[in-house]
Structures are given as structure tokens and as C-alpha cells.
Design a protein with these regions (language model features):
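Extracytoplasmic
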Residues: 23, 31, 51-53, 57, ...
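Active-site-adjacent helix/loop patches that line small-molecule binding or acyl-intermediate pockets
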Residues: 22-24, 28, 32, 80-171
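Bacterial N-terminal signal peptides
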Residues: 7-14
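Active-site SXXK
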Residues: 55-78, 104
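Short, hydrophobic/aromatic-rich segments at coil-to-beta transitions
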Residues: 189-198
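Beta-lactamase-like hydrolase cores
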Residues: 15-52
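Structured C-terminal helix/loop/strand segments within mature extracytoplasmic catalytic/sensor domains
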Residues: 20-24, 98, 115-123, 163-181, ...
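Bacterial N-terminal signal peptides that target proteins for export
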Residues: 1-7
Length: 284
């Protein structure tokens, strides 16, 4: 067989793959101006001022805004009942089960947050966000959908002033702590409270892009995008993000994580150092 032909065929196979592997982009709100970082899996490759023209699809982030509205307007809980009628229920619950608001946000259950199911009218929605000087894309239910393209700057603006964001941040900590995202919790800890998102890159059904958006522990808004799904982005770049994301110097009250570690792994015995003798219980 002609070896030149083989090499040529291999090049055709690998070139599209290489083209899809774009650097991770991280937008971070700054005191003077917003920063845009480009990262490889090994670290930062470029830092610049965030362009006003950089766009992103909303993806699953629209659910975060519905969640904020529900919380801020004190809407009663309306659990979604899974009946096995929709393939989208894979993000929600098993047939015969139900899902509530907080869990739906973490799992990205779009069926729960559907405005029609929650009886959210276009007028009440628009008035609510207009009063808060939200971007035009957020004040319209017709544009609150995954394919809507918005500027990253306007997205960061909306996150900076999002109602009920303290509650959202508390709930979204579970996204990073998800044991299915191997290595993410050990790298990022509780430094980020984010809603994941995924969509089609440049509207091409065969190419996925994803990431997340939310806040650092101190409330600083951030946005991330990369090739692949949000889970792929988190697991692939957790180490690189660990190097660039700031570590909080102070932890506010209420930001600790309650873990029932010893309920699952009870202690059998506590011994003194270099001894097999059990330590007797004592106070002080």
C-alpha cells in the first residue's frame, strides 16, 4: 500500500479533531475591568481584557434565572413528577419519583423550570427584571432559551446583581462536590458555586461546548467555556483552574460544609501516637 496515501488519510482523520480542541476560556470580574484567561490543561496561556463583543450561548443557565425568580418572589414549591414520558427526565428523576427546586437546579432539570409549567407570565416576568435593570435578553421569556447568544459581559453583570444569589450559591456547591466529577472537589473545593451549561458549538449538532457560570466564594462572578460537555470541562481543567482561581483569605459565617463523614465511616478506636492503646474519652 502507498504509505503517502496512508499518512494523508490519517491527517484527514486527525485534523478535525485538533480543530475542535480550543483553549478553555475563563472570564472573571475584576475591580478595574473584567479579565479573560485562556487555559490549556497545564495552565494559563494568555490573559487579556474581556472584549465587550465576546458572546456565549445561554445553554442551561436560563434555569438559574428562573430559580432566582422563584426564590425572590417566594413562590411555593411545585415538585415535578417524573412519569417516564420524556427523555429529558434523565436529568430529573426516575419514573414514579419527584424532584424539588434545589435538586432540580443542581441536576439541571429543565422540565422543572419550564415557565409554562410554573405559570410564569411574560408580563410579570418582564416587569420583574426591568425593575432590576436586567439585560434585555433576561427580561423577555421568548429569549430565555439555550440557543440565545448573549455577551459574556452582560452575563457577568446579571450574575453580579442576581436576586437570591446567596441561596443559589449555597445550593450550587453540590455541583462541584458531585462524586461523578472525579478530581473536581479535591482541586476546587468550595471556591466556586456554579451552574453548569452545555450547548452546540457554532450551532453544529455534532460538536459540543460547555462550561459553567456563577460565583467565587466572595461573590465574584465568573464564566467558563471549553470544548465538550460541562462535565468534561470541569474534570479536564480542574487542575488548571485550581492554579488560577483565587483562594479566599476569609470565610464568612455560614459558608462551611456539613459532612456526616463519621456517620458513614464510624471510628472504631482512637489511639495515642506510636501506641495501640485506646485513648479514654475525656472533655477538654
Amino acid at each position: 500500500m502507498n504509505w503517502r496515501r496512508i499518512v494523508w488519510l490519517l491527517a484527514l482523520v486527525t485534523l478535525p479533531t485538533l480543530a475542535e480542541e480550543t483553549p478553555l476560556q475563563l472570564a472573571l470580574r475584576g475591580a478595574q475591568h473584567d479579565q479573560l484567561y485562556q487555559l490549556s490543561s497545564s495552565g494559563v496561556t494568555k490573559v487579556s481584557v474581556l472584549p465587550d463583543t465576546l458572546n456565549t450561548p445561554l445553554g442551561s443557565l436560563w434555569k438559574l434565572y428562573v430559580y432566582a425568580w422563584l426564590e425572590d418572589t417566594h413562590q411555593p414549591e411545585q415538585p415535578y413528577q417524573c412519569r417516564g414520558n420524556s427523555p429529558e427526565e434523565v436529568y430529573c428523576c426516575q419514573a414514579g419519583e419527584s424532584i424539588t427546586r434545589d435538586t432540580a437546579l443542581v441536576r439541571s432539570c429543565g422540565l422543572y423550570f419550564a415557565p409554562q409549567r410554573l405559570h410564569i407570565g411574560a408580563d410579570m416576568w418582564g416587569q420583574y427584571w426591568q425593575q432590576r435593570q436586567a439585560p434585555a435578553w433576561l427580561a423577555s421569556l421568548t429569549t430565555l432559551k439555550p440557543e440565545t447568544s448573549v455577551t459574556v459581559k452582560s452575563l457577568l453583570d446579571s450574575l453580579a446583581t442576581l436576586p437570591a444569589q446567596n441561596k443559589a450559591q449555597e445550593v450550587l456547591l453540590d455541583v462541584v462536590l458531585d462524586e461523578a466529577k472525579i478530581g473536581v472537589a479535591s482541586m476546587l473545593g468550595s471556591r466556586v458555586r456554579v451552574k453548569t451549561w452545555s450547548w452546540f458549538a457554532d450551532d453544529k449538532q455534532e460538536i459540543r461546548q460547555g462550561g459553567f457560570a456563577g460565583w467565587l466564594t466572595d461573590g465574584t462572578p465568573l464564566w467558563v467555556t471549553g470544548s465538550g460537555t460541562s462535565k468534561t470541562v470541569l474534570t479536564r481543567y480542574a487542575t488548571a483552574l485550581n492554579r488560577v482561581l483565587p483562594v479566599p483569605t476569609q470565610v464568612a459565617s455560614g459558608q462551611c460544609v456539613l459532612v456526616d463523614l463519621f456517620a458513614r465511616y464510624p471510628l472504631k478506636k482512637v489511639t495515642e501516637e506510636k501506641s495501640t492503646t485506646a485513648v479514654k474519652p475525656k472533655i477538654g
